[in-house]
């Protein structure tokens, strides 16, 4: 990939400043608004926050992992960083578009790269109805909550909640309950990425529910509608021998 203008984002309070200084010497970095790609140094959280902040620029992101898991990141390799970027492969992620309404009628709209989730706000389990493409599919789910995950996000919170990992090119979404109480044996559903999913919260006064789109949280929600959108494609760069698809496969075999 022919990339000449690169911007660099990092946490100035990072404990890895010595490594960051090495990376800073590799390029004559430009302003973010002038960049053809953005390098983000940190972990998955730093990458997600900066994707949300700069996705409107429609340029690719290359993550360098200095965090823990770093599922969406590339391993630290300062010696070959320039070569790795220019030989990198591109993965296109289509985020989820969430529209949520709270008890006052306020409407919120947000994008999620990993997942949209709803969850109980108090000690009482949440109760909600699930519609898919305008058709009621479950009249009442009693659970701590539920989430809808993209393929890229299926190995994160979704996997911890018992949901399956989706191949990146599967064109599907995971609908996964969080600690389902009734129906107790329901483990969720796989849906086409073209599906529109709606959660209708029941007993909102006694059983309040919050909703999140990645790290953005909204309180006292009564309705949540979620669908995948191709209007804002996100481009992630990965080393040619360390692609996101490979990581998703390895994760399923304990890698």
Swiss-Prot record:
Q: Which reaction does it catalyse?
A: NAD(+) + ATP = ADP + NADP(+) + H(+)
Spell out the molecular function terms from Gene Ontology. ATP binding; metal ion binding; NAD binding; NAD+ kinase activity
- Does the record's keyword annotation contain Nucleotide-binding? yes
Q: Which Gene3D superfamilies match?
A: Probable inorganic polyphosphate/atp-NAD kinase, domain 1, Probable inorganic polyphosphate/atp-NAD kinase, domain 2
Q: Tell me which residues bind NAD(+).
A: 44-45, 49, 114-115, 144, 152, 155-160, 216
Query: A biological process (GO) annotation for this entry?
Result: NAD metabolic process
Recorded E.C. number(s)?
2.7.1.23
Q: Which cysteines are joined by disulfide bonds?
A: none
State the compartments where it is located. Answer: Cytoplasm
Q: Which residues form the active site?
A: 44 (proton acceptor)
Instruction: Give the PANTHER family listed for this entry.
Output: NAD KINASE
Protein name per its UniProtKB record = NAD kinase
């Amino acid at each position: 990939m022919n990339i000449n203008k690169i911007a660099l984002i990092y946490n100035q309070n990072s404990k890895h400043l010595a490594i960051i200084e090495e990376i800073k010497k590799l390029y004559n970095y430009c302003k973010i608004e002038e960049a053809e790609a953005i390098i983000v140094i940190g972990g998955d959280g730093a990458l997600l926050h900066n994707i949300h902040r700069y996705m409107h620029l429609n340029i690719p992101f290359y993550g360098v992992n200095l965090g823990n898991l770093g599922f969406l990141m590339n391993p630290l390799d300062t010696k070959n960083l320039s070569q790795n970027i220019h030989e990198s492969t591109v993965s296109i992620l289509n985020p989820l578009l969430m529209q949520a309404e709270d008890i006052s009628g306020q409407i919120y709209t947000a994008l999620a790269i990993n997942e949209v989730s709803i969850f109980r706000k108090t000690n009482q389990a949440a109760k909600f109805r699930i519609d898919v493409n305008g058709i009621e599919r479950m009249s009442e789910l009693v659970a701590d909550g539920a989430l809808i995950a993209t393929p890229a996000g299926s190995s994160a919170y979704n996997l911890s909640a018992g949901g399956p990992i989706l191949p990146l090119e599967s064109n599907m979404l995971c609908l996964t309950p969080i600690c389902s109480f009734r129906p107790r044996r329901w483990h969720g559903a796989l849906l086409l990425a073209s599906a529109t999913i709606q959660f209708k919260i029941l007993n909102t006064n006694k059983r309040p529910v919050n909703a999140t789109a990645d790290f953005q949280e909204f309180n006292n929600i009564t309705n949540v509608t979620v669908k995948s959108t191709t209007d804002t494609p996100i481009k992630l760069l990965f080393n040619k021998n360390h692609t996101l698809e490979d990581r998703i496969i390895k994760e399923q075999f304990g890698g």
